[in-house]
Design a protein with these regions (language model features):
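Metal-dependent phosphodiesterase/nuclease catalytic metal-binding core
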Residues: 49-182, 191-207
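A glycine-rich helix N-cap at a beta->alpha junction
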Residues: 37-51
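Conserved residues at the C-terminal ends of beta-strands
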Residues: 21, 145, 183, 213
Length: 214
C-alpha cells in the first residue's frame, strides 16, 4: 500500500481510491502518514474510503464490488467484483430485431441489468462466506487464504482464526470457480511440502483448478 500511494504521489498522478474496513481506517491513516514522513519528510496524498460488510460499491461504470464479511481477530473483509451488463429480458427472446426496436421506440424497457461475478478475494479469515452472497460460488476466480495445511496444525488455525486446508477441501464441491488461488500459506512450510500436501487432497479435476501463490 505505501508503494502504491508513494509512486502515484511522486508521479503526480491523482490518488487512487483505497477501500478499507471502517474500524481500521484511523489506524491505517496513522501508519501511512508516519511512513510518508520517514520516506520524504512530507505527507502523501491518498484517499481512504471506509467500508462495512455487505456494502455495494460502484467504482466504475460497469463494475461493482460487494464487501464480504469475514471472521478474524481484527476486522477483516473480502471483496466480490462483478461486471454489470444489460441483457434482453427473457420475454423478448423470441422477437426479431425489428420488433424489439419497435418496442424500444414505443417506450418499452426491453433490457434488464445483470451482474456477472469476475473475481473474489478473501482477506484474513477463519470462515468462508459462501452464504453471504449468491454469486460468490459462481466467481470464475476465487483468491483465498489457506494459512495452515497439515493435520497437526488444525488447532493452531482455530486459535489464530485462519483457514485450514480442510475447509478449502470442504467447499470445493460447492464452488464453480475455474481458478481457486490459495495464498497466505504459513512460512513454516517449504514449497515441496505445500505442493505435495495440498494437491494430494484433491481429485484430478480439482487439482487443475487449484493455483498456489507461494
Amino acid at each position: 500500500l505505501p508503494i502504491y500511494i508513494s509512486q502515484r504521489w511522486m508521479a503526480g498522478i491523482s490518488p487512487g481510491k483505497i477501500f478499507v474496513p471502517a474500524d481500521g481506517l484511523h489506524q491505517i491513516s496513522q501508519i501511512l502518514d508516519q511512513i510518508s514522513k520517514l520516506d520524504c519528510n512530507s505527507l502523501w496524498t491518498y484517499e481512504l474510503i471506509p467500508v462495512q460488510p455487505n456494502d455495494r460499491i460502484e467504482f466504475r461504470n460497469n463494475l461493482v464490488a460487494y464487501v464480504l464479511p469475514l471472521t478474524h481477530r481484527v476486522t477483516s473483509v473480502g471483496y466480490l467484483i462483478c461486471e454489470v451488463r444489460k441483457k434482453l429480458k427473457p420475454e423478448f427472446h423470441t422477437l426479431s430485431g425489428s420488433e424489439i426496436a419497435a418496442l424500444k421506440k414505443s417506450g418499452v424497457t426491453v433490457t434488464h441489468q445483470v451482474e456477472l461475478p469476475k473475481v473474489a478475494y478473501l482477506g484474513d479469515t477463519s470462515t468462508i462466506p459462501m452464504n453471504d452472497h449468491p454469486l460468490l460460488a459462481e466467481s470464475p476466480t476465487l483468491i483465498s487464504e489457506c494459512t495452515f495445511i497439515l493435520p497437526e496444525d488444525r488447532k493452531k488455525a482455530v486459535d489464530t482464526m485462519h483457514l485450514h486446508l480442510d475447509q478449502i477441501v470442504e467447499i470445493m464441491p460447492k464452488i464453480k470457480s475455474r481458478n481457486v488461488v490459495l495464498t497466505h500459506l504459513s512460512r513454516r512450510y517449504d514449497t515441496a511440502t505445500i505442493q505435495q500436501t495440498i494437491f494430494s487432497r484433491f481429485s484430478r479435476s480439482d487439482q487443475e483448478r487449484i493455483k498456489l501463490l507461494i
